[in-house]
């Protein structure tokens, strides 16, 4: 039996705020930029939060074609992909095989780097939290292609919509270089719309300044 499912970005933002996943303020990023917000998906560490995130991923996947296997990069992507497989089954009556990778290859038992469903000859969607520099995604894409997979696309929780070292964002660079789609559940624009709706003018002004300086 399936239940109606419709991901609500505002509800997800509110949950992220309540869990400390999303914070507004001043945060120095690895790039040296001082960001007016910070997003840490590792704090989506309870059943309700993980369930809402997985619902979002599942809803997105139902709009995508060619979903043979879903894949979660180690380590953070592993619970995300497992929960998404459950959400697809429970909310959409769609049973999708899933897998993940190890950080280090195993030389005993089943061995290798990949765990779970076979990706050989399959169209695979990668599920992760964010794409910051794109390094991790590129590594996973290489692993999957070496195993015979075709990369159908990538799903992330947040698109920061800001430039990297050049004029493109990390997501745009990945899309251009790897020629695959990347979809996000929420974007920086969604965060700004949320602040605007809540009348948080000071935080919104800081977001707008940051967007003008670094946005795409």
Swiss-Prot record:
GO terms for molecular function: magnesium ion binding; orotate phosphoribosyltransferase activity. CDD domains: PRTases_typeI. Pfam families: Pribosyltran. GO terms for cellular component: cytoplasm. It is an enzyme of class 2 (transferase). Orotate binds at residues 38-39, 132, 160. The keyword Magnesium applies. Its cofactor is Mg(2+). Its EC number is 2.4.2.10. Keywords: Glycosyltransferase, Magnesium, Pyrimidine biosynthesis, Transferase. HAMAP family: PyrE (MF_01208). Homodimer. PANTHER family: OROTATE PHOSPHORIBOSYLTRANSFERASE 1-RELATED. Belongs to the purine/pyrimidine phosphoribosyltransferase family. PyrE subfamily. This is Orotate phosphoribosyltransferase. The gene is pyrE.
